[in-house]
Amino acid sequence: MAGLPTNSNVLERQRLEQQRQEQQRIDALKHFGQLFKQRQIEPSADARAHWQQVLQLGFPGSKHEDWKYTPLERLFAHEFSFPHAPDVTTAQCDALSLVPNAHRLVFINGQFSPTLSDRECGPYQLTHAAENVPFPTAIQSEVFLHLTESLAQERLHIRLPVGQHSDKSLYLLHISSGNDSDMVNTSHS
């Protein structure tokens, strides 16, 4: 019967689609590799080790059990870049804050802003981690964890000591810049 799809036509389309998706994952790895090289500071040994894990694991495909229902192709269709920090005022932070009575820490494009954050955070302890301080061991190692850790350029550890309680909640205000292009900013600058 002419015009009806045959098993070989269906299988060929599936094979071509799998090849397209595999190429998309390879291209995404190359793009993130360029971002890794564009970091503003030299990557630590820990960041380089995480990047090697990204390369070793690769991005999961549709047959990967944990990711089979997650359409990563839409994520890979975007271009990512490190954003430039916009000028943000305290008044703008106040207008964007949803929780008025809290210890507020402000992050602009993923970078901690001490000038816009509350100076006093009650019992919460803030520590800026140097690049040479190793990351804590991952609970579950996976490619996006390693990608995040390899691109991170600044780390802030927030800790509430055992037995301590705060009269106010801790509010993390993340402000991200954007533009009209299809470029997606990473929040690791």
Name the predicted role of every residue range.
Residues 2-189:
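Glycine-rich and polybasic anion-binding loops at the starts of cofactor/ligand-binding domains
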